[in-house]
Regions:
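Outer-membrane beta-barrel porins/channels
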Residues: 1-191
């Protein structure tokens, strides 16, 4: 359970106040060892829903959604021999917040603001989580574009040294973040 305090205006705007909200997470993790020939492999799966909670208000006549997120992850670890191990991982994330309706060409600003209040801001945070799966104006393709995914691999030698690399992908319509990652690590025993 978490308490959220957000003061985005920094007291520079007299028309807004600090926002307050509460949120919680739900997570599930499964881990199993499988025999692949003579090798004992590890298969792991996890699900996490983060920031399930209230909406946040900054002193206006409507509240904003906090970034509720659904994450799914899968990992497979394969021992090569007594000293070497390689792991492969995949991860998918989707924001569980409804898409804000777009303003229609013939719609006045006042009519659009009223439609936002009726169709977007008045939705509860829990209802918003469920409607986020079917609210894209681009249909199923748009819903699939809302999913960010990542893949990665890690090599470990003697549980002492590791090398890892990965790739993250986000649709151009959702922010267009695409990047590779790399890293190394070592275990150091200290008295």
């Amino acid at each position: 359970l978490r308490y959220i305090y957000s003061d985005i205006s920094g007291h520079y705007d007299d028309n807004t106040t600090a926002g307050n909200a509460f949120a919680a997470d739900i997570a599930c993790y499964y881990n199993n060892y499988l025999m692949m020939g003579a090798r004992e492999c590890q298969l792991s799966f996890g699900v996490n829903i983060k920031n399930i909670g209230s909406k946040i208000n900054y002193g206006e006549d409507y509240s904003y959604f906090i970034p509720t997120n659904l994450g799914l992850g899968l990992s497979y670890s394969l021992p090569i021999n007594e000293y070497n191990r390689i792991s492969f991982s995949a991860d998918a994330n989707k924001l569980l917040v409804p898409s804000k309706p777009l303003q229609m060409e013939d719609e006045t600003n006042e009519a659009y603001e009223q439609r936002l209040r009726d169709e977007y801001y008045d939705i509860s945070s829990i209802k918003g989580m469920f409607t986020s799966f079917a609210d894209s104006e681009r249909g199923f393709k748009g819903e699939m574009e809302e999913i960010q995914w990542s893949i990665g691999a890690e090599y470990v030698y003697n549980d002492k040294f590791s090398l890892r690399a990965g790739y993250h992908h986000e649709s151009a319509n959702q922010g267009n973040r695409k990047y590779f990652t790399a890293g190394a690590g070592f275990r150091l025993n200290v008295l």
